[in-house]
Amino acid sequence: MMSPLVIKLGGVLLESDNAMMRLFKALLDYQKSNKRHILIIHGGGRLIDDLMNKLSLPIEKKNGLRITQSEHINVITGALAGTANKILLSWALKYKINAVGLCLADGKSVNVEKLDQDLGHVGKAKPGSPLFLTKLCEQGILPIISSIGITDDGLLMNVNADLAATALATTLKANLILLSDISSILDGKGQRISEINYLQAKKLISQGIITNGMIVKVNAALEAARVLQRSIDIASWQNTDQLKLLFNGINIGTRVLV
């Protein structure tokens, strides 16, 4: 059997019925003819931003990571582990996919500790135990996992979903796809880069071609490639037929090399 596949969802996907339809149709079609274990992990940055704005709460970021004050973590947990997670679960059920909504702490699948005092309740994700998630997958259940973690002393932590996905893939010795509305990494002329390695990526970052949140995404992919010793795909959900190719290991976006 192929290695498990972790699909990290991001961008506007959670807000787009069209995107959800394409994704879950592709997943359903793929599962009909393939026995590969698939897991979904997600963030929900835009959903959090909308909620924070409605509540007149400040949105602060440092190096692409959200600063999460102690008085805000319950709101963010509700948005990610609650609303965003259950939206995805509802789409899975709509397409008759047997799924369960989880967070990083369930089954101790991903361990989390505080990343940086200045960031507040922002967690650093580390590999955990594969047993719980493997058992679910073996029963034909699709785990849908939010990027909310819990520390050993019981503190809720908001974890960058790209970094959480890396830790999850490491836990399961899985392949990793970073799926969003961004189809690929672009060069200085706006052209797709089909493959990129560490030195090339760092050069584009130093040149200001890769910026902001994309830096976190690329660094997460580079770290995942290093830890897993396998390439990582950055791709878009836009084309259903291409998604099926992607699930079978064919590069449709940018492949981050070891």
Swiss-Prot record:
<dbReference type="GO" id="GO:0006526">
    <property type="term" value="P:L-arginine biosynthetic process"/>
</dbReference>
<keyword id="KW-0418">Kinase</keyword>
<dbReference type="Pfam" id="PF00696">
    <property type="entry name" value="AA_kinase"/>
</dbReference>
<keyword id="KW-0055">Arginine biosynthesis</keyword>
<comment type="function">
    <text>Catalyzes the ATP-dependent phosphorylation of N-acetyl-L-glutamate.</text>
</comment>
<feature type="binding site">
    <location>
        <position position="66"/>
    </location>
    <ligand>
        <name>substrate</name>
    </ligand>
</feature>
<keyword id="KW-0547">Nucleotide-binding</keyword>
<dbReference type="GO" id="GO:0005737">
    <property type="term" value="C:cytoplasm"/>
</dbReference>
<keyword id="KW-0028">Amino-acid biosynthesis</keyword>
<keyword id="KW-0963">Cytoplasm</keyword>
<dbReference type="InterPro" id="IPR004662">
    <property type="entry name" value="AcgluKinase_fam"/>
</dbReference>
<feature type="binding site">
    <location>
        <begin position="44"/>
        <end position="45"/>
    </location>
    <ligand>
        <name>substrate</name>
    </ligand>
</feature>
<comment type="similarity">
    <text>Belongs to the acetylglutamate kinase family. ArgB subfamily.</text>
</comment>
<dbReference type="GO" id="GO:0003991">
    <property type="term" value="F:acetylglutamate kinase activity"/>
</dbReference>
<comment type="pathway">
    <text>Amino-acid biosynthesis; L-arginine biosynthesis; N(2)-acetyl-L-ornithine from L-glutamate: step 2/4.</text>
</comment>
<dbReference type="InterPro" id="IPR036393">
    <property type="entry name" value="AceGlu_kinase-like_sf"/>
</dbReference>
<feature type="site" description="Transition state stabilizer">
    <location>
        <position position="8"/>
    </location>
</feature>
<dbReference type="InterPro" id="IPR037528">
    <property type="entry name" value="ArgB"/>
</dbReference>
<dbReference type="GO" id="GO:0005524">
    <property type="term" value="F:ATP binding"/>
</dbReference>
<protein>
    <recommendedName>
        <fullName>Acetylglutamate kinase</fullName>
        <ecNumber>2.7.2.8</ecNumber>
    </recommendedName>
</protein>
<keyword id="KW-0067">ATP-binding</keyword>
<keyword id="KW-0808">Transferase</keyword>
<dbReference type="InterPro" id="IPR001048">
    <property type="entry name" value="Asp/Glu/Uridylate_kinase"/>
</dbReference>
<feature type="binding site">
    <location>
        <begin position="181"/>
        <end position="186"/>
    </location>
    <ligand>
        <name>ATP</name>
    </ligand>
</feature>
<feature type="binding site">
    <location>
        <begin position="209"/>
        <end position="211"/>
    </location>
    <ligand>
        <name>ATP</name>
    </ligand>
</feature>
<dbReference type="GO" id="GO:0042450">
    <property type="term" value="P:arginine biosynthetic process via ornithine"/>
</dbReference>
<feature type="binding site">
    <location>
        <position position="158"/>
    </location>
    <ligand>
        <name>substrate</name>
    </ligand>
</feature>
<feature type="site" description="Transition state stabilizer">
    <location>
        <position position="217"/>
    </location>
</feature>
<comment type="subunit">
    <text>Homodimer.</text>
</comment>
